[in-house]
């Protein structure tokens, strides 16, 4: 059983290998981050969803937010996915089951011909410069995901107005 990361909680620092070499680090202090967890190379809706990031490049830059994409895929699968989608953001791979559970993600077993490993269902986390979860969205299916353009508008509002982390009462 997974437990959700509460809004306002410290985001666990996760370090994953990155497509193209090096590592991608999620969590920690000092910057705004948006970590988008996708199901994997086998998911056409993930390709469409993350393919929309390119049109939002300027808005992402203006928000001063680092966007990273994460999956449980292998290096080869993640590299192929990033190339097929034309991703211009860091892509971390090799998310393991313990990390998926730590993030409170739903985990699915593959159907025939999907992939060769269990994988996370979609999740999106906005981490503030204090290293805390500002916004969290976790889904159990590929069909329900937040609109990134609207989310970027919300982040700009949060930054400009000092809007508090919501969902922390009770």
Residue ranges, per PLM feature:
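Chalcogenol-based redox active-site neighborhoods
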Residues: 1-170
